[in-house]
Amino acid sequence: MGLKEYLFGKSSEDRACEFLRKLGFVILERNFHSKFGEIDIIALSSDKILHFIEVKATSGGYEAEYRLNKAKYMKILKTINFYMMKNEPNRDYQLDLLVVKNENFELIENISL
């Protein structure tokens, strides 16, 4: 990944966090890493559900959400399980996808493949 792509991704995640805060989420962690993978954003909703949020962004005309393939999804699930065992074993949680297209945001909640 080049510098331009890195900066675009970071900017998109920054904007995603602001969008989530406006919806009432509290951002707990960003870019959580484990040996299994990474989770872009971990946030707590007003109803106290833990949200693991994968951010996909595009400035082009293609559908960013299709970049979440089965292999990436499985890595995220393993990372969630690791996080839950270590930090929040009894809390309700879900996996969400936040699509950023230019200035538009679409939060797709509780995704599965």
Curated annotation (Swiss-Prot):
Gene3D superfamilies: 3.40.1350.10. InterPro entries: Restrct_endonuc-II-like, tRNA_endonuc-like_dom_sf, UPF0102_YraN-like. GO terms for molecular function: nucleic acid binding. Pfam families: UPF0102 (PF02021). It comes from the Bacteria. PANTHER family: UPF0102 PROTEIN YRAN. Belongs to the UPF0102 family. NCBIfam families: PRK12497.2-4. This is UPF0102 protein Ccon26_01140.
